[in-house]
Amino acid sequence: MWLLLLLPLWGGCAEPGDSEWVNLPSKCEVCKYVALELKSSFDETSRTRELIDTRYGFLEDDKKAKKIKYTNSDIRLIEVTEGLCSRLLEYNLHKERSGSNRFAKGMSETFQTLHHLVHKGVKVVMDIPYELWNETSAEVADMKKQCDVMMETYEDVIEDWYRHHQEADLTEFLCARHVLRGQDQSCLEEHWDSRKGDTGPSTGTKKQKKQGEKKNKSKKENSGPEEERRQMEQPTAAKEEL
């Protein structure tokens, strides 16, 4: 069975001024995902007890030098911020979504369907060749470009948050108070709705909870009938002693 489809779905082939094809991310949307990836990256690097030795070779006898926690070190801040914008290239454009939610990790529902048709032997004809279906869209490429500028411009703000204000929400601190101060902040109120194929940043909380539940469940299952009988006999034994 053959199906002929002519679908203009990819922003990569559009002219920069063609609003019907390309809807570049706003400053609000860029900051939202910069903050989201910063949170995720800081969370990923918070699960270590590694100590950093502040002494250098020619200062080995310096008794004042001491080890500091990696989680409080400049090294952690540099490692997180250095490759931050590259993480945005993991996002794809989901044109079936609206607002800032059109940016999400994972393949869009539309392209999942098209790939499924191709694998079933259906011929799908679009305005771009099949080999370019998974290329970075113009919108995502622009988001990465804006991120590079934003990270450089607000480097001091991010460092200030890291050193003195980690109790404050990073999206609120970076975007609402600084980057978007006096500007449109409506996208910050748009909540990310996970759908099939999406792989949003994970904090590990849910995973740890499930592992704990599984451990308790396994403990109950392994107790067996013998353990239940022993527990039932305990009150009787105590009564006989009295």
From Swiss-Prot:
GO cellular component: endoplasmic reticulum
Domain Saposin B-type per the UniProt entry, residue ranges: 26-235
Ranges for region Disordered: 191-242
UniProt signal peptide: 1-19
Compartments in which it is found: Endoplasmic reticulum
Intrachain S-S bonds: C28-C187, C31-C175, C85-C147
Start-end of Basic and acidic residues biased regions: 210-242
InterPro entries, A to Z: DUF3456
Iron-sulfur as UniProt keyword: no
Keywords in alphabetical order: Chaperone, Disulfide bond, Endoplasmic reticulum, Immunity, Innate immunity, Signal
Family membership: Belongs to the canopy family.
Taxonomy of the source species: Eukaryota, Metazoa, Chordata, Craniata, Vertebrata
GO biological process terms held by the UniProt record: innate immune response
Protein name: Protein canopy homolog 3
Domain of life: Eukaryota
Protein source organism: Xenopus tropicalis
Coiled coil region boundaries: none
Function: Toll-like receptor (TLR)-specific co-chaperone for HSP90B1. Required for proper TLR folding and hence controls TLR exit from the endoplasmic reticulum. Consequently, required for immune responses.
